[in-house]
Amino acid sequence: MRRRLPLFAAVALLAAWPAAAQPILTHLADGNDWKRSSIEQQRAYLAGVSNMISVGAAWDAKNLPGSEQTFSRTAQRGLKHTDLEEAVRVVDGWYRANPTQLNKPILSVVWREIAKPQFPPAK
């Protein structure tokens, strides 16, 4: 029995090894997802993004006190004057105006169409 346990453990590890070696594929929600979603789901998605940015900015403030140029802090500044309904309208309008770009992630649209225009152009 003692000889079988190490053999079983070795077989189990070898069986799991290929699964661990596979890359993790991440799907970022895009325009196709946006178009299929109800208004409530769209609001929930954007509220989740807002919460993620707020938590990230709070973490940055605590752990990186001198660094104002983190993604979360920058995004928070760029989005602070936009409410949820306006964000839904902007994202919805962008995908309506760009039907061939439904594969563009929603986060990219939020950044480029809402947050980034709040900053002066880079020199």
Q: What are the language-model segments listed below?
A:
Residues 1-8:
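Bacterial N-terminal signal peptides that target proteins for export
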Residues 16-18:
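N-terminal signal peptide c-region/cleavage motif recognized by signal peptidases
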Residues 23-31, 55-123:
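Compact alpha-helical subdomains of small soluble proteins
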Residues 44-55, 112:
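Short, hydrophobic/amphipathic alpha-helical patches that form generic packing surfaces
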Residues 11-14:
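Single-pass transmembrane signal-anchor helices and their membrane-water interface zones
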Residues 22-47:
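Immediate post-signal-peptide N-terminus of mature secreted/exported proteins
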